[in-house]
A protein has these predicted regions:
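Proline-centered turn/helix-capping motifs that create local helix->coil transitions or kinks
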Residues: 71-77
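Disulfide-bonded cysteines in secreted/extracellular proteins and peptides
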Residues: 11, 33-36, 90
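Electrostatic cytochrome c docking/interface patches
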Residues: 10-29
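Sec-dependent bacterial lipoprotein signal peptides
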Residues: 1-9
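Thiol/selenol-based redox catalytic cores and closely related redox-interacting motifs
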Residues: 69, 90-91, 98-112
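Inter-heme linker and motif-flanking segments adjacent to c-type heme-binding CXXCH motifs
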Residues: 14-17, 42, 110-112
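The canonical Cys-X-X-Cys-His
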Residues: 24, 30-39, 62, 104-108
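Gly/Gly-Pro-rich "capping" loops immediately C-terminal to redox-active cysteine motifs
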Residues: 21-25, 38-71, 87-95
Length: 112
C-alpha cells in the first residue's frame, strides 16, 4: 500500500485536476532508486553514481536499460564490467509506466 501511494504521488494533479507529467525525482524516490544509488544519485556500495551519465546514455537507451538491465548489460562491455563491482543486480522496471521511466531518465541525465 505504501509503494502504491508513493508511485501515485509521483504523478501529481495540476490545478485543473488533470494528471501532470511525472516528476523524475519523485519517481526516483518512489521506485526505491535511492536505496542503491543514494538520495542524490552519488552512488553507494550497492550501486554506481548516476552523475555524469549523459555522456553514455540517451533518454531512449536509458529507458530501454531500465526495462531489461540484465539483457542490456550483457550486450554492453562497459556495463558488464561495472556489474562485477556490485553485489546486487540492477532491478528490472518493466512494469513501470513508460512516462515514469522517461521522467527518471530525464532526471538522471540532468545530474551534473
Amino acid at each position: 500500500m505504501l509503494v502504491l501511494s508513493s508511485v501515485l504521488g509521483a504523478c501529481a494533479q495540476d490545478a485543473t485536476g488533470t494528471l501532470a507529467a511525472p516528476s523524475g525525482e519523485r519517481v526516483y524516490a518512489a521506485q526505491g532508486c535511492a536505496l542503491c544509488h543514494g538520495s542524490d544519485g552519488a552512488g553507494s556500495s550497492f550501486g554506481p553514481t548516476l552523475h555524469g551519465k549523459a555522456r553514455y546514455w540517451t533518454r531512449e537507451k536509458l529507458v530501454a536499460y531500465l526495462k531489461a538491465p540484465v539483457a542490456y548489460a550483457e550486450a554492453d562491455p562497459r556495463l558488464a564490467e561495472q556489474k562485477k563491482r556490485y553485489s546486487l543486480p540492477m532491478r528490472q522496471f518493466d512494469k513501470v509506466p513508460e512516462s515514469e521511466l522517461a521522467a527518471v531518465a530525464d532526471y538522471v541525465l540532468h545530474l551534473p
